């Protein structure tokens, strides 16, 4: 009887030493992801400085993103015969509605040519700058202006770029 009592006592002792944890809890969670429309940029209109007259002194024509022009040095902007088709470069940026994006303009000059005659375009500006926000329809108009450098006694003619300039947009 004593052996049975010791056996029961030992069993209860071992049972008392076993640990049952009541301090644990578990939960689950779902996973999701949203893919937004990729950002895109499309040219709507090429840049055009319009008509300018060169003199014996070099100068510049500044075209703002709003499409207004000013001049410095020996360049004049004739009022007779019209100004020509003056326009900043216009792009449509599209993507996810209400998202912001950064704008990267060229950092180097672009050369425009008329045969062997050349001029350079640089000092790029944009509206908006340096970031834009897409509207609720996912689009925004981006306008780019620049400065045209006209040489002294620049040869008359239509000057165009052989290589277009690049504007880059990226989501912020």
Question: Which ranges hold each PLM region?
Answer:
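Extracellular beta-sheet repeat scaffolds used for adhesion and glycan interaction
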Residues: 117-133
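Short acidic, flexible loop segments centered on an aromatic residue
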Residues: 103-111
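Sec-dependent signal peptide hydrophobic core
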Residues: 5-12
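Positively charged n-region of N-terminal signal peptides that target proteins for export
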Residues: 1-4, 18
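N-terminal small/polar-rich segments of proteins
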Residues: 22-104, 131-172
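C-terminal segment of classical bacterial N-terminal signal peptides
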Residues: 14-22
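Short aromatic-acidic-glycine turn motif
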Residues: 42, 110-120
């Amino acid at each position: 009887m004593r052996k049975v009592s010791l056996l029961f006592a030992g069993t209860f002792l071992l049972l008392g030493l076993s640990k049952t944890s009541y301090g644990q809890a578990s939960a689950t969670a779902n996973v999701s992801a949203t893919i937004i429309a990729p950002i895109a940029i499309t040219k709507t209109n090429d840049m055009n400085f319009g008509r300018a007259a060169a003199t014996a002194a070099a100068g510049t024509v500044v075209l703002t993103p709003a499409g207004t022009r000013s001049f410095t040095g020996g360049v004049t902007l004739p009022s007779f015969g019209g100004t020509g088709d003056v326009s900043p470069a216009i792009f449509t940026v599209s993507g996810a509605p209400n998202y912001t994006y950064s704008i990267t303009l060229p950092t180097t000059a672009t050369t425009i040519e008329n045969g062997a005659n050349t001029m350079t375009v640089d000092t790029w500006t944009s509206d908006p700058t340096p970031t834009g926000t897409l509207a609720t329809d996912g689009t925004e108009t981006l306008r780019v202006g620049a400065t045209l450098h006209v040489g002294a006694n620049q040869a008359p003619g239509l000057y165009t770029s052989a290589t277009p300039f690049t504007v880059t947009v990226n989501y912020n």
